[in-house]
């Protein structure tokens, strides 16, 4: 997860969406077409979907998963596991190549050092909690920050979804700098209507968006973010794809240039009561299992 502070806090919230862990067990779809009743209210559907996302974030679940993150500097792949004390992560590949023995040793040493550094571990946990709280505030704002227009239905990855176009609500008064980014953004939402779950958010800045009357910084027109969600295991929904393209300025001189694509896969359920240390051990066991399989040529 990319984290920024101060003038770029709104961007940090958008980035945090991919790892917010918006997952919830919901009944599997029966394959029926989306049911759109006469007098369908797009705003109300968004409100229901947002309520489900917030509820899902408070759910009792944990997953292990893999994230491939691509930036202009290259590609890094990490294995993650949710624990009751935060999300633990371990680097497993660079530029789609397995780590060298030296790199593996360095990564193991980093994890061990983190476990033995209580102050750093608490700082990491505090940061993750603050990121999650910012995400929740932003998600709660969606029904009021935009006006929504029904554009039809479509099928995406086997899901029948409703497409809603959104544009800023002129009556919306952003309660903080974080929400100011919504005043210059339009795009579309895809919502699975039976379960009222957000399947995709695609937003683009149609104008420069300033923070603190432009004194603290701004994001440039044309910036875009995409977040894709879907059921991944036993009906659980979570983020599977995220794409970010933003430029701007912070505090007059510091440039903001974020070009990131993340794809998450290999989801599986793990116990919800794992400690951070147990999560790290699980990551190590997973890594050792992959190495053993590779050394045996994939034979069981």
Where are these regions (language model features)?
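Intrinsically disordered, low-complexity segments enriched in polar/charged small residues
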Residues: 8-9, 74
């Amino acid at each position: 997860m990319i984290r920024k502070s101060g003038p770029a806090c709104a961007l940090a919230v958008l980035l945090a969406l991919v790892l917010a862990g918006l997952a919830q067990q919901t009944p599997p779809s029966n394959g029926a077409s989306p049911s759109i009743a006469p007098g369908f209210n797009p705003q109300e559907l968004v409100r229901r979907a947002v309520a489900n996302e917030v509820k899902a974030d408070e759910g009792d679940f944990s997953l292990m998963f893999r994230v491939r993150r691509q930036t202009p500097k290259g590609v890094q792949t990490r294995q993650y596991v949710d624990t009751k004390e935060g999300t633990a992560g371990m680097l497993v590949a660079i530029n789609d190549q397995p780590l060298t023995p030296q790199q593996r040793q360095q990564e193991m040493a980093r994890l061990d050092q983190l476990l033995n550094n209580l102050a750093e571990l608490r700082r990491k946990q505090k940061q993750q909690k603050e990121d999650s709280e910012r995400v929740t505030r932003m998600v709660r704002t969606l029904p009021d920050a935009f006006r929504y227009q029904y554009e039809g239905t479509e099928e995406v990855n086997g899901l029948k979804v409703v497409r809603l176009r959104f544009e800023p609500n002129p009556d919306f008064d952003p309660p903080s700098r974080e929400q100011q980014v919504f005043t210059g953004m339009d795009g579309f939402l895809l919502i699975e209507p039976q379960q009222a779950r957000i399947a995709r958010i695609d937003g683009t800045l149609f104008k420069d968006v300033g923070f603190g009357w432009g004194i603290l910084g701004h994001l440039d027109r044309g910036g875009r973010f995409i977040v894709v969600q879907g059921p991944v295991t036993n009906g659980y929904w979570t983020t599977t794809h995220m794409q970010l393209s933003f430029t701007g300025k912070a505090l007059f001189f510091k440039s903001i240039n974020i070009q990131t694509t993340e794809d998450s896969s290999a989801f599986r359920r793990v116990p919800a009561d794992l400690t951070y240390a147990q999560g790290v051990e699980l990551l190590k066991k997973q890594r050792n299992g992959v190495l053993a399989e590779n050394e045996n040529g994939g034979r069981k």
